């Protein structure tokens, strides 16, 4: 919210839909009808402002990140050097597939880009899944928040297999499951917590995935889109601890 709106109110000061309907903010008495109407008008104006800012953000141009030679999106752009980064997102099992999906839909990159994304498979427990770079829940499941999913497709089966492997690995390590990119218990010289990708061995190319063990609760929240019952149980386990 702070990214979209200057001077955003504290999260606990944002009224719920029920409170808006009653015409009162948290912890305050109901207001007269005229004030409720004025508040509703102000809320609609704020929503309109957010809509316009979202449209401006959605209009961003990504074409300069597309590498025609390999049919992939660069991981970034070096402003100082005025050139694309030579590395590219080259795996379908990546959070970057959401950008690929949207850019193809917008016509910013050709459809062949989708088929240039790597589809190497890995197996565990009799199930096959796409292999990702770091074996994190984020890579498999973040796009599911927006992208459509269809039963028994490669992506659908891969997401389910990835969650199953995460659950299995949690049992092996005797901890709640859910490993992904996250902050962890290390700080820099400014006492800022560090952030990097963590994952599960067997799901990712990256070496040393079993060296660290960091559980990210949001990984279970992402899994609600795939295995809601198991994810709810795991979230409750995390809350109890």
Predicted regions and their residues:
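Ser/Thr/Asn(+Pro)-rich, low-complexity disordered segments
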Residues: 1-241
